[in-house]
Amino acid sequence: MLLVPHILSPVSAPWVAWVMLFLLLCGVVAEMVQSGVVVQAFSTIFAKVERSYGDVQHNLLEELIMNIFRIGTFAMALYLYAYRAGDFRFATYLLVAAWVLGIDAVKLAVAAVVNYTFRISKRFALISTHYNNLWTVICCGFYVALLFLLNIDNAVLTKWLLFALALVAIVLIFIKWIRIFCTDMRSFLYIVLYILTLEVLPLLVMIMGAGYIVD
């Protein structure tokens, strides 16, 4: 009788290295398609949006590639956070990635409704650019952390480190939104409400959904 080997930890799953290499190539290709896009993401992390709200130039190919990098990296981190024991499967990772993509699509739809309701197309486009730059920085941080976390066999340490990274990400988003919007106490309360409803709540939904998928 032949014994079928099982993937019992992330580091022993050969597909993980290929996925991480693919995500790295996505970042490199995006930088080649639009030179300076990654550097710009880091240099504008705490920049304040100009009040002129000028036209924003978009490169659709670069945006598509960077979205693949962001979703793929965050899905890997989410899978690793929800992972307990047993097989570390590529199919499960794809399901988690699809779950992340679905939540992002809902957030985008909500943002589009806000844009349509308040007629803030130019301002919304510029804010979206700054937001995408911020998430590029956050996912670069997650990617570097994953290179370490995928090679250790300590689920408790992995969860705590990923939780700490998530808290740092939320703090960065909070600081960025204060830089963009905060003018008085009312705007500050709006920012807090936004962070809770469109950042923290979706993150909790992602974690719960990933837990069901992995189980």
Predicted regions and their residues:
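Alpha-helical transmembrane segments with an aromatic anchor "belt"
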Residues: 82-151
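Alpha-helical transmembrane segments and their membrane-interface exit regions
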Residues: 26, 47-50, 100-105, 166-174
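Terminal transmembrane helical module of multi-pass membrane proteins
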Residues: 142-215
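N-terminal juxtamembrane cytosolic/stromal segments of multi-pass membrane proteins
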Residues: 1-65, 75
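Hydrophobic alpha-helical transmembrane segments of multi-pass integral membrane proteins
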Residues: 24-25, 63-81, 102, 106, ...
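Alpha-helical transmembrane segments
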Residues: 11-28, 90-103, 155-165
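Membrane-water interface at transmembrane helix exits
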Residues: 30, 39, 43, 78-83, ...
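Membrane-interface helix-boundary motifs at transmembrane edges
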Residues: 53-61, 85-90, 120-127, 154-156, ...
